[in-house]
């Protein structure tokens, strides 16, 4: 990785720390959001990318299968990530489908939807308390 960082290709930028206000713009510019990490819980970066409708590619972790319900492109290793990126370059319509899946993640974790879930939960608990 040091070799790539020291001499990145022209289409790869390492911006360092980015101001939060600028992140939405950068996510919106992204052709693909790729998070290759092995050890994540539930990174906010996924929700941020989804809220900007950036297509999402992640490592194939069990956690993501449960919380994102297939609304992303799972990959097992760097080679599969590379193949998927090349596939999207050749077939941009598949990338559009992935963008639609990002919208589904954004809806699922929107303030409005989460508020509905919590209100339902508290109403159910209040009803149980009255019995």
Residue positions per predicted region:
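Short alpha-helical donor nucleotide-sugar binding micro-motif in glycosyltransferases
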Residues: 17, 25-30
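C-terminal alpha-helical cap of glycosyltransferases
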Residues: 111-131
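Nucleotide-activated donor-binding/catalytic signature segment of Leloir-type glycosyltransferases, i.e.
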Residues: 1-18
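Short hydrophobic beta-strand element within catalytic cores of glycosyltransferases
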Residues: 55-58
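A short hydrophobic beta-strand element within the catalytic core of glycosyltransferases
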Residues: 33-34
């Amino acid at each position: 990785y040091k070799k790539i960082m020291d001499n990145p290709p022209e289409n790869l930028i390492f911006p360092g720390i980015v101001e939060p206000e600028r992140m939405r713009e950068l996510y919106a510019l992204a052709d693909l959001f790729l998070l290759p990490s092995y050890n994540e819980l539930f990174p906010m970066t996924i929700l941020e990318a989804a809220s900007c409708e950036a297509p999402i590619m992640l490592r194939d972790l069990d956690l993501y299968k449960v919380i994102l319900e297939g609304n992303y492109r799972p990959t097992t290793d760097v080679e599969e990530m590379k193949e998927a990126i090349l596939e999207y370059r050749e077939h941009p319509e598949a990338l559009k489908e992935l963008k639609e899946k990002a919208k589904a993640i954004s809806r699922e974790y929107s303030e409005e939807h989460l508020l509905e879930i919590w209100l339902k939960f508290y109403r159910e608990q209040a009803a149980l308390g009255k019995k």
